[in-house]
């Protein structure tokens, strides 16, 4: 699917929702609108600031303008320079700061108050705490007994599409992108004439937990929005895993269709919502997902 097709899907879905389509988006770079690149090292520099991200560590460059343009065009670690065979102090400190940020978002919990504020039913997997979640991924693939009963009692049965939100490995991905992806996604699915299930939040969930959810609720399509494993300096990336007629015993990873890198610096959440709506419609038409779908 090329950019033109994606933009057409966005316009179509937004028009059906009675909203103006957003302007065609471009991949955003965190350094695009930052201050002029800095070449000197400073202990007082905030390592998470735009100034630190724009820092150029190459001393006495032959073409400083080329390095400046390169630095502004990407969030990758370029133009950091060297001190002999080793990285410069500023580059190393920023690397460590970004690594710490990534670890923090993995270990953080989605606040219960936040879940209640969104009006979401909260259930959990067989995991009871974050440490167990990181060490026993198999337990994160199954709902606890209380969760199974809650879904049967409080969720719409036999929906065309069931939307599930889970913290996964990034709390920030859920809390930052939620407002921009779930409302347009739910509205788009309903505008398409589909029976949409009750959206809910799964704490400590892994991707395969959507198979059990689909089986319990009798959903034709299950869409799981889950926090991605964070990269260095990027802790807000969300993924969508969609699967048709999932079954715990027979569904394999190749049966899933994944849309990753959903965040303001990648695929914008509103745009992703429109693409997911179109994907769900095609899954229902073809009665397939993953590698079984025709392009």
Curated annotation (Swiss-Prot):
Pathway: Amine and polyamine degradation; ethanolamine degradation. Gene3D superfamilies: 6.10.140.690, 6.10.250.2060, Ethanolamine ammonia-lyase light chain (EutC). Transmembrane segments: none annotated. Belongs to the EutC family. One of its GO terms (cellular component) is ethanolamine ammonia-lyase complex. Its EC number is 4.3.1.7. One of its GO terms (biological process) is amino acid metabolic process. The keyword rRNA-binding does not apply. It is found in: Bacterial microcompartment. It catalyses: ethanolamine = acetaldehyde + NH4(+). InterPro entries: EutC, EutC_C. Partial trypsin digestion of this subunit (removing the first 28 residues) yields an active protein less susceptible to aggregation. Its main location: other. Inhibited by 5-adeninylpentylcobalamin (AdePeCbl), a cofactor analog. Irreversibly inhibited during catalysis by cleavage of the Co-C bond of the cobalamin coenzyme. Reactivated by EutA, which probably involves an ATP-dependent cobalamin exchange. This is Ethanolamine ammonia-lyase small subunit. GO terms for molecular function: cobalamin binding; ethanolamine ammonia-lyase activity. Catalyzes the deamination of various vicinal amino-alcohols to oxo compounds. Ethanolamine ammonia-lyase (EAL) allows bacteria to utilize ethanolamine as the sole source of nitrogen and carbon in the presence of external vitamin B12. It is spontaneously inactivated by its substrate and reactivated by EutA. Directly targeted to the BMC. May play a role in bacterial microcompartment (BMC) assembly or maintenance. Adenosylcob(III)alamin binds at residues 207, 228, 258. Induction: When grown in ethanolamine and adenosylcobalamin (AdoCbl) (at protein level). Note this experiment was done in strain JM109, which expresses the eut operon. The keyword Lyase applies. It comes from the Bacteria. Keywords: Bacterial microcompartment, Cobalamin, Cobalt, Lyase. It holds the Pfam family EutC.
């Amino acid at each position: 699917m090329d950019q033109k097709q994606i933009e057409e899907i966005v316009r179509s879905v937004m028009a059906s929702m009675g909203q103006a389509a957003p302007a065609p988006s471009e991949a955003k770079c965190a350094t695009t609108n930052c201050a002029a690149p800095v070449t000197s090292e400073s202990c007082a520099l905030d390592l998470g600031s735009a100034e630190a991200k724009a820092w150029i560590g190459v001393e006495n460059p032959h073409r400083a303008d080329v390095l400046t343009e390169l630095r502004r065009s990407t969030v990758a670690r370029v133009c950091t320079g060297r001190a002999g065979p080793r990285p410069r102090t500023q580059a190393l400190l920023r690397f460590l700061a970004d690594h710490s940020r990534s670890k923090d978002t993995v270990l953080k919990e989605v606040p219960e108050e936040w879940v209640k504020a969104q009006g979401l039913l909260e259930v959990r997997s067989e995991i009871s705490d974050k440490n167990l979640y990181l060490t026993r991924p198999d337990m994160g693939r199954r709902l606890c007994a209380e969760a199974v009963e809650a879904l049967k009692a409080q969720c719409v049965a036999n929906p065309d599409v069931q939307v599930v939100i889970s913290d996964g490995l990034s709390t920030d991905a859920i809390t930052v992108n939620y407002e921009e992806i779930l409302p347009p996604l739910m509205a788009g699915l309903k505008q398409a004439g589909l029976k949409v299930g009750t959206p809910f939040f799964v704490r400590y969930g892994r991707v395969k937990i959507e198979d059990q959810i689909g089986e319990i609720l009798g959903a034709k399509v299950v869409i799981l929005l889950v926090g991605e494993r964070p990269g260095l300096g990027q802790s807000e990336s969300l993924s969508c895993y969609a699967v048709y007629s999932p079954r715990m015993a027979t569904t394999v990873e190749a049966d899933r269709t994944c849309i990753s890198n959903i965040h303001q610096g990648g695929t914008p959440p509103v745009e992703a919502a429109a693409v997911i709506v179109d994907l769900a419609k095609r899954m229902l038409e073809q009665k397939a997902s993953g590698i079984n779908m025709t392009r």
